[in-house]
Each structure stands twice: as C-alpha cells, then as structure tokens.
Amino acid sequence: MNSSDEEKQLQLITSLKEQAIGEYEDLRAENQKTKETCDKIRQERDEAVKKLEEFQKISHMVIEEVNFMQNHLEIEKTCRESAEALATKLNKENKTLKRISMLYMAKLGPDVITEEINIDDDDPGTDTDAAAETCVSVQCQKQIKELRDQIVSVQEEKKVLAIELESLKSKLGEVMEEVNKVKQEKAVLNSEVLEQRKVLEKCNRVSVLAVEEYEELQVNLELEKDLRKKAESFAQEMFIEQNKLKRQSHLLLQSSLPDQQLLKALDENAKLIQQLEEERIQHQQKVKELEERLENEALHKEIHNLRQQLELLEDDKRELEQKYQSSEEKARNLKHSVDELQKRVNQSENSVPPPPPPPPPLPPPPPNPIRSLMSMIRKRSHPSGGSTKKEKATQPETAEEVTDLKRQAVEEMMDRIKKGVHLRPVNQTARPKAKPDSLKGSESAVDELKGILGTLNKSTSSRSLKSLGPENSETELERILRRRKLTAEADSSSPTGILATSESKSMPVLGSVSSVTKSALNKKTLEAEFNNPCPLTPEPGEGPRKLEGCTNSKVTFQPPSKGGYRRKCVGSENQSEPVVVLDPVSTHEPQTKDQAAEKDPTQCKEEERGETQPEFKEDSSGGKTGETDSSNC
C-alpha cells in the first residue's frame, strides 16, 4: 500500500513538473516573439528618427540658401540705390555748371556768346548722348536684366522652398505622431514583458518548490526503502531464530518426552509471537497513516482557520464601513443642527436680551442627626415594613397622648430657660472643626456608634453596672412616658394640676449621687437609645423616618469630664456649632418636628452662641434620668 501511494504521488509530481516545464517553454517562446516584435519596432523607430534628422538637415540647408539669396538681393538693391543717388548728384552738378557758364558768357561779347552758344548747343547734345550712352549702355541693361531674372528666380525658389518647408513640417508632424504611437506600443509591450516576467518568476518559484518537494519525496522514499530493507532483514533474522528455536524445541521434545501441557504452552507461545509480530506491523502502519492524516488535518485546519479569519475580517470591514458611513451622516446632521442652533442663538441674542435668572431656593432646615440615627437603628432592627404597620395600627391612641406630654415638657423647658436656670459652661476649645464628609451607609454609622458604646462600657467599672441591677433593663424613655401617662390620667380634669404634677415629677431635685452611678446611668441611657428596637412611637401617618442630611452633619463623642459625657453635633453648614451635652443626670424627652419648630428662638440663639445647656440631676428617690432636646443639632 505504501509503495503504491508513493508511486502515485511520484506520478502526480512528475505530471505537475511536466506541466510546469511546458508552461515555462510556452512563456519563453512568447517572450522571444515579443522580443522580436520589440526589436522590429525599435528598428522602425530608428529609421523614422534618421529620416527626421535628414529632413531637418535639408530644411536647414534650404533655409541657409534662402537667407544667402535674401542677403545678396539686399546688397544689389543697396548698390542700385547708391548708383541712382550718384546719377542724381551728377545731374545737379551739371546744371549748376551750366548756370555758372551762362553767367560768364553774359560778360563776354555777343559774337563770343553766339559761338559759345553754338558750342554749348553742340555740347548738350553730346552730353545728352553721353548720358544716354551711360544710361542706355548694354552692360547696365544686361546687369539690370540679370538682376531682375535673379530676383524672379530667387522668389520662385523661395516659394518652392516655402512649399517644401510646409510639406516637411506636415511630414514631421506625421512622423512625430508615428513616434508617439511607437512609444505607446513600446510602453504596452514593456508592460506585457513585465507581466510575462512576473509569470515566469512565479513559474520558476513553482518549479523550484516542485523540485524541492520532489527531492524531499526522493529522500523520504530512500529512507523508507532503507527502513523496509532493515525491517525485512530483521524479519529474516527473526524468522531464522524462530526456526532455530523450533528445531531446538523439536530436539528437546524428541530427547525428553514432555508433558502435554508443555507442548500446548509452546504452541501458544508460537501463536502469540506471530500475533505480536502481526500486531506490531499493523500498529506501525496505523501510526504512519495517523501521522499522515494529522499532517493533512493540520494543514486543512490552518487553511480553514485562515478562511474563517478572512471572512470575519471582511465582515468587520463591512461593519466598520457601515459605521463610518453612519457616523459621517450623523456628523453631517449634527453639523447642520449646530449651525441651525447657532443661527437661532444669534437671532435670539440680537433680538431679545435674556431674562434675569430666578432667585435661588431657600436653604433646607438644618437636619437632626440624632433623629436620623435613631430612625436608622429602627430600620436596622426592623428591616421589613410589616411590623411598623402593625405598631401603627396597635398604638394610634397612645401617640396623641405622647404628643400632648411632649408639648407640656417643651413648655416647661422654655419656662425654666426664661427664668434663668444656671447652665454649666462647655469647653469650646475641644470642639473639632466641621469637615464635609462623604455619604456613608447606615450600617457603617451604626457600627461606629456601637464601637464607641463598647469602649464606654469597657471604661466604666463592673460595680456600677451591678449596682443598677435588673431595674435598668427598662429604657428611660419608657419610664418617663409611663410616668407622664399616669400623671395625665390622674390629673386630666384640670390643666393646672397636669402642669403641677408633671413639673413636680419631671423637675430634677438636686441630690448627692455618686459619680460612678451617674456615669453608669448615662451609659445605660445611651445603650437604650441606640439598641432599643422601637424607642419612640411614631406619629400616625408618618411612617419610618429616613436618614436625611448625613452628609452635612457629624456626631462626635468626648471623653467624660467632671463626671459626665458630652456629645457634639457638628454641621458643615453652620459656622457656630451647637453643642448638646448628655450628662449622667440629664433627662431625655421626646419631641416631634412640629414641636421643634415651635421652640422659642431665644433658645436657638443661646445654643448658637455656644452657651451652656441646663443640667438636670436625677431624683434621689426615683433614680430616673431625663432626655434633653437634641433637635437643634
């Protein structure tokens, strides 16, 4: 099989080589023919150029002769004119001489005059005869005739030469046209020759490649022949060894009668050896076939991949051309629209001046960061909105009572501020400058606050936490609201009684409480504020509050000074920063947005100027803390 395939390949290669050689010979013959035609055209061109040069020489000779004749004619004309001028001068001189002679003869006698006159009569006749002889001499007439004949002949020659010149010029133009045609044909022939040379070079390359492939195939053939010979020799050696082994086995069998099992094993061994050799030969053939297939498949895959890449590139090119055309159209449309808009703008600027800009909107009210943080914590503890709806449904009545209590508490606070309660001074030097912070998520703010609370928990002693006991598990806000509710129910009949009881209950009594218990209570209130799932009952119809204005506010905590913790609410919009001090004995009271707006402006002014806030101490009997209003932060 291999030998037949190799012979077929060799036949194909030889046929291709013969075809390439035949094409090469045909192209060579065509090249020779084109060279012969080119040589003929060159010879014709050279002959035409020679004829042109001869015509040019003849025309130059004729022009020189004509110029010589014209010069000779001009010389003869000048000679004749000079002769005529001399004749006129002589006539004038003769006349003057006659006049002079007549004057002299008048002086002489009449006899002499008559004689003289006779002599003179004879003389003018002789003079006229001499003049006639001079004028009518044969030589002059001959010369004049010759000159006239020469002039006529020269003119005729001139006409003939002019005609010849015109004919030569026409011939020259025709020859030039022929030369141009020959040049064009030569250029065409040169281009054809170049093309044929390129084809010849391609054929040479193809023939070189074919020869190289033929040589490679010859080398492979020789190698395969050598390998086949080696394989045959190896097979012969193996066959000889196998025969030797068979003989030895027969001798052994004859010498010692073995068992039937040994005979069967030997037979099986021989069969297995034959099968192994056959399988080895088949395996080698399969390996060769697979290698050839792999080579062919690799080439086909490369060609297929290249074709696919070509198609993809062509598609990309078309898409890019379409995009380019569309972008050009868009650019034109945009230019047109820009021009129209510029025209409109120019017309509007020229026609009517622009109206004044509207006034800027009023700045929003300052946000309440503590309220926003509380709403954030509420959202974190209650992510779903179903629980808030249930709470709103279950507690619509208590919200109205709480709002009334809040209003009463605000009025009480305002009365105390107006009466002039002594306020604690606040250290304003430790106040940090307001810096614009970027908007952070609710989770990061809550994590920071919880970390601060953790540090506060670590700083305080464990005794203060144990001394509080299980009574502090309830939040301070719930206690205050419960107490206010009881007082409101007890004294609902008279508003003065409500005010008195609420004032007596909410008014702090100055007592001696240890600083440890104060700090512990303050910590517990802070933890209750930030960790309570629902510290404030929302107003009906309000829904969960959102965190607004976090970018313009910042909450900072200060370490305890003189037994209390201070918290600052710094706003980047306000230059004078309001300070809220959370003391261990201060009371926390809830407020709504409307109540915060109804506050007295004097309190806001005092807080902006940096004055201290009222300090409310815990009652010794109850041990409860209040809440300061922090809506102005």
Curated annotation (Swiss-Prot):
KW Cytoplasm (keyword) present: yes
Region (Disordered) residue spans: 343-508, 525-633
Residues modified to Phosphothreonine: T487, T496, T537
A single GO molecular function term of this UniProt record: kinesin binding
Coiled coil location: 7-353
Biased segments, Basic and acidic residues type: 403-418, 590-621
Post-translation changes: Phosphorylated on Ser-101 and Ser-249 by PAK1 through a CDC42- and RAC1-dependent signaling pathway, which enhances its association with F-actin retrograde flow in filopodia and lamellipodia of axonal growth cones. Phosphorylation on Ser-101 and Ser-249 is increased by netrin-1.
Sites bearing Phosphoserine, chain numbering: S3, S4, S101, S249, S375, S473, S494, S506, S515
Gene Ontology BP terms: actin filament bundle retrograde transport; axonogenesis; Cdc42 protein signal transduction; cytoplasmic actin-based contraction involved in cell motility; endoplasmic reticulum polarization; netrin-activated signaling pathway; neuron projection morphogenesis; positive regulation of axon extension
GO cellular component entries: axon; axonal growth cone; cell leading edge; cytoplasm; cytosol; filopodium; growth cone; lamellipodium
Compartments, as annotated in UniProt: Perikaryon; Cell projection, Axon; Cell projection, Growth cone; Cytoplasm, Cytoskeleton
Bias kind Polar residues: ranges: 456-465, 490-505, 550-559
The entry's keywords: Acetylation, Cell projection, Coiled coil, Cytoplasm, Cytoskeleton, Developmental protein, Phosphoprotein
Tissues in which the protein is found: Brain-specific (at protein level). Expressed in hippocampal neurons.
Residue numbers of N-acetylmethionine PTMs: M1
Composition skew (Pro residues), residue ranges: 352-369
Induction (record text): Up-regulated by axonal regeneration.
Effect of S101A: Inhibits F-actin retrograde flow at the peripheral region of growth cones
Domain notes: The N-terminus region is necessary for interaction with actin retrograde filament flow and accumulation in neuronal growth cones.
Subunit structure comment from the entry: Interacts with PFN2. Interacts (via N-terminus) with KIF20B; this interaction is direct and promotes the association of SHTN1 to microtubules in primary neurons. Associates with microtubule. Interacts with L1CAM; this interaction occurs in axonal growth cones. Interacts with actin filament retrograde flow; this interaction is enhanced in a netrin-1- and PAK1-dependent manner and promotes F-actin-substrate coupling and concomitant formation of traction forces at axonal growth cones. Interacts with RUFY3.
Family, per entry: Belongs to the shootin family.
Functional note: Involved in the generation of internal asymmetric signals required for neuronal polarization and neurite outgrowth. Mediates netrin-1-induced F-actin-substrate coupling or 'clutch engagement' within the axon growth cone through activation of CDC42, RAC1 and PAK1-dependent signaling pathway, thereby converting the F-actin retrograde flow into traction forces, concomitantly with filopodium extension and axon outgrowth. Plays a role in cytoskeletal organization by regulating the subcellular localization of phosphoinositide 3-kinase (PI3K) activity at the axonal growth cone.
Protein name according to UniProt: Shootin-1
Lineage, opening ranks: Eukaryota, Metazoa, Chordata, Craniata, Vertebrata
